[in-house]
């Protein structure tokens, strides 16, 4: 049995770090392992222009406590976003813009109601080389929550890719067999997808059978076992269009364990060990480096990291609770054994 592996330093291509005191509590866990992370812009108020993005970046760097961690900044697309906003953000170093369908997830009320309303913005993004990151769910009240992603593929994503064939798009945190198949069947190299640890480790039975487990509640919601298996097959395939994105989303314990609990799993703490466990279980540890360290950088057109991290197979127990401003936070797989960790 493999006891130690050394890989190129990984990156996290989908991360929430919030703001204020919470930011200071959660950034170090990511900075200890990952070289870079795509920072989600759904603050209150959202990050909608270059100046807000750069100010947010400065706050994250201050919380990284002297590491070489690089936050990669994004804009929150609204129906007031302009092509000039995109060009200014690109010039300032913003690498991507995020499409949140209005009402789809945490702090998405300012999102887009109809993607056609921002077609001029998408054209500007394609022209200047800014990536589009997509929360791939429709929000129509008559669409079942377990079907939102599938409908999005047909109704929104496919027409957008046709309209903008040079726009590079990341379908984030995919949860369905249909999404995995859509990415693998797409003709061209302009569509990629991130996969979270929770969607690879769990399905909706884990969340609902024997009692509701609120710390597994996230959006897009966990799906049937057949979808979990399809996601695992996708990463096992070695297809370079799939890459690591934790979607780590910190919420205080009392905000999760509530009558109307928040969506999101906090997975930044020990994240690379969670992925290593999954890849070991699938018998594909040799593919972890590409998934975690190469595929995302290559898709974004960024250089791969040049330093390395070493993982050792020394089982440890994920803490039941971690300190967080405003109350503790329960990490993904709390109280359970994780086999791999950073050396």
From Swiss-Prot:
InterPro entries: Amidohydro-rel (IPR006680), DHOdimr (IPR004721), Dihydroorotase_CS (IPR002195), Metal_Hydrolase (IPR032466). Belongs to the metallo-dependent hydrolases superfamily. DHOase family. Class II DHOase subfamily. Zn(2+) 1 binds at residues 14, 16, 98, 247. Pathway: Pyrimidine metabolism; UMP biosynthesis via de novo pathway; (S)-dihydroorotate from bicarbonate: step 3/3. Disulfide bonds: none annotated. The keyword Lyase does not apply. Binds 2 Zn(2+) ions per subunit. Zn(2+) 2 binds at residues 98, 135, 173. The active site is at residue 247. Catalyzes the reversible cyclization of carbamoyl aspartate to dihydroorotate. Substrate binds at residues 16-18, 42, 135, 219, 251, 263. Keywords: Hydrolase, Metal-binding, Pyrimidine biosynthesis, Zinc. The keyword Ion transport does not apply. This is Dihydroorotase. Its cofactor is Zn(2+).
């Amino acid at each position: 049995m493999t006891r130690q592996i050394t890989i190129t330093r990984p990156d996290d291509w989908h991360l929430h770090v919030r703001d204020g005191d919470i930011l200071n509590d959660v950034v170090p866990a990511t900075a200890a392992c990952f070289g870079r992370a795509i920072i989600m812009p759904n603050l209150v108020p959202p990050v909608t222009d270059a100046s807000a993005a750069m100010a947010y970046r400065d706050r994250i760097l201050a919380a990284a406590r002297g590491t070489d961690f690089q936050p990669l900044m994004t804009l929150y697309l609204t129906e007031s976003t302009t092509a000039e906003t995109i060009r200014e953000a690109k010039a300032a170093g913003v690498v991507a813009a995020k499409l949140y369908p209005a009402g789809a997830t945490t702090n998405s009320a300012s999102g887009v109601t109809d993607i056609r309303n921002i077609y001029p913005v998408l054209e500007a993004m394609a022209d200047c080389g800014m990536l589009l990151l997509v929360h791939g769910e429709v929000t129509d009240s008559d669409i079942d929550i377990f079907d939102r992603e599938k409908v999005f593929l047909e109704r929104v994503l496919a027409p957008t890719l046709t309209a903008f064939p040079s726009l590079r798009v990341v379908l984030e945190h995919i949860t369905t067999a249909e999404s995995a198949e859509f990415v693998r069947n797409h003709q061209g190299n302009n569509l990629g997808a991130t996969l979270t640890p929770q969607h690879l480790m769990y399905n909706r039975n884990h969340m609902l059978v024997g009692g509701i487990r609120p710390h597994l509640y996230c959006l897009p919601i966990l799906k049937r076992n057949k979808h979990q298996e399809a996601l695992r097959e996708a990463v096992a395939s070695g297809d370079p269009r799939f890459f690591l994105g934790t979607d780590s989303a910190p919420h205080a314990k009392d905000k999760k364990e509530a009558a109307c609990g928040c969506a999101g799993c906090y997975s930044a703490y020990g994240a690379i060990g969670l992925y290593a466990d999954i890849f070991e279980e699938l018998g594909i540890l040799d593919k972890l480096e590409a998934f975690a360290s190469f595929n995302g950088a290559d898709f974004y057109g960024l250089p791969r990291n040049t330093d390395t991290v070493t993982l050792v197979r020394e089982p440890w127990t994920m803490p039941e609770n971690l300190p967080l401003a405003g109350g503790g936070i329960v990490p993904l797989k709390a109280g359970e054994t994780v086999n791999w960790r950073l050396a």
